[in-house]
């Protein structure tokens, strides 16, 4: 009986150790004037997109960037497929890096659910430093979704692990159009881990 108890305790400890060591994914902090948003980046599932985001992060190119766009059902009168996101990044694209290949959600398995971070883009292969965070589930942004005519969706690459209350406060700001009159300053984006 004692051997069984010891075995169960060792098994439980092993599970905790394995699960704790399993996440080698980087964690970044988006430091805004409204609070911090911490995000786990899924380097194991979206390696190209995460490497690109970290290149901007490590080069301090997100310093003094902003959240400038809030997309809600009430400010998309002409869009048949409505989404809910906050968008940020570098409005000044000078000094940035080349666009990256498009890692679709069908390739990565990272779907646009509540708190997921994803790259903004015009066409496939055009993403650089603009990103958005989903407020609620947004399946129309996944591969095969109807938000983009090309059906390729957007490149989701991580999830908010703390600070969704900050995301929701930004989302709730008054915005007559999709673009904030007073942008929310992002002081910096840096690695935590």
PLM regions: where:
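Bacterial N-terminal signal peptides that target proteins for export
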Residues: 1-9
């Amino acid at each position: 009986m004692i051997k069984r108890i010891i075995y169960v305790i060792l098994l439980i400890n092993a599970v905790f150790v394995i699960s704790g060591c399993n996440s080698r994914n980087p964690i970044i902090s988006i430091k805004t004037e409204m609070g911090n948003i911490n995000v786990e980046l899924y380097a194991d599932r979206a390696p190209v997109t995460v490497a690109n985001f970290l290149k901007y992060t490590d080069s301090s190119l997100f310093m003094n960037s902003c959240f400038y766009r809030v997309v809600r059902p009430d400010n998309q009168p002409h869009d048949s497929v409505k989404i809910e996101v906050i968008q940020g990044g570098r409005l000044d694209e000078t000094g940035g890096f080349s666009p990256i290949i498009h890692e679709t959600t069908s390739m990565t398995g990272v779907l646009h659910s509540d708190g997921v971070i994803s790259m903004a883009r015009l066409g496939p292969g055009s993403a650089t430093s603009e990103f958005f965070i989903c407020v609620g589930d947004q399946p129309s942004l996944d591969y095969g979704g109807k938000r983009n005519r090309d059906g390729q969706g957007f490149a989701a690459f991580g999830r908010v692990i703390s600070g969704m209350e900050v995301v929701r406060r930004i989302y709730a700001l008054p915005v007559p159009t999709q673009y904030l009159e007073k942008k929310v300053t992002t002081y910096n984006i840096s690695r935590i881990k």
